[in-house]
Swiss-Prot record:
Recorded GO CC terms: cytosol; cytosolic large ribosomal subunit; nucleus
Further remarks about this protein from its record: Present with 21200 molecules/cell in log phase SD medium.
Keywords from the UniProt entry: Acetylation, Cytoplasm, Methylation, Nucleus, Ribonucleoprotein, Ribosomal protein, RNA-binding, rRNA-binding
Assembly behavior: Component of the large ribosomal subunit (LSU). Mature yeast ribosomes consist of a small (40S) and a large (60S) subunit. The 40S small subunit contains 1 molecule of ribosomal RNA (18S rRNA) and 33 different proteins (encoded by 57 genes). The large 60S subunit contains 3 rRNA molecules (25S, 5.8S and 5S rRNA) and 46 different proteins (encoded by 81 genes). Component of a hexameric 5S RNP precursor complex, composed of 5S RNA, RRS1, RPF2, RPL5, RPL11A/RPL11B and SYO1; this complex acts as a precursor for ribosome assembly.
Name used for this protein in its record: Large ribosomal subunit protein uL5B
Species whose genome carries this gene: Saccharomyces cerevisiae (strain ATCC 204508 / S288c) (Baker's yeast)
A biological process term (GO) from this entry: cytoplasmic translation
Family: Belongs to the universal ribosomal protein uL5 family.
Length: 174
């Protein structure tokens, strides 16, 4: 019994998974992208507006140009597993942020196991995973707000080692 018991408060967990499809225009393509996210997550997606006008892309301020959905719990882990399978369980080192979150993109949503529908088309999407530890709520709650100490904050190294261990995955340097 020389091994020390792991503190359960130090275990990393997936707080949420955000799926985003940025279409770049409002209208029919945006509603079709919304259907894709609804099929994948079983939740109603939210439309995102452009922050400012970009004339070269033909985007106006406050025009709806993207859809996203936030998934939590076991469903988030299941969708993330399908996304990582498409990426062959390989992510680059720069996919991980300094705060311990990570993200990646896929080119075709049909790789996730969704049946191709010619009326919808094919969309790529971004996966973004927010990681935390138990006790992170103290920074966000309304009453008795507190801070998380530096030793308990999620770091890039913690997330990379968790990712390698949980998914038996590779993190490439380049």
């Amino acid at each position: 019994m020389s091994t020390k018991a792991q503190n359960p408060m130090r275990d990393l967990k997936i707080e949420k998974l955000v799926l985003n499809i940025s279409v770049g225009e409002s209208g029919d393509r945006l509603t079709r992208a919304s259907k894709v996210l609804e099929q994948l997550s079983g939740q109603t997606p939210v439309q995102s507006k452009a922050r400012y006008t970009v004339r070269t892309f033909g985007i106006r301020r406050n025009e709806k140009i993207a859809v996203h959905v936030t998934v939590r719990g076991p469903k988030a882990e299941e969708i993330l597993e399908r996304g990582l399978k498409v990426k062959e369980y390989q992510l680059r080192d720069r996919n991980f942020s300094a705060t311990g979150n990570f993200g990646f993109g896929i080119d075709e949503h049909i790789d996730l196991g969704i049946k191709y529908d010619p009326s919808i088309g094919i969309f790529g999407m971004d996966f973004y995973v927010v990681m935390n530890r138990p006790g992170a709520r103290v920074t966000r709650r309304k009453r008795c707000k507190g801070t998380v100490g530096n030793s308990h904050k999620t770091t890039k190294e913690d997330t990379v080692s968790w990712f390698k261990q949980k998914y038996d995955a590779d993190v490439l340097d380049k």
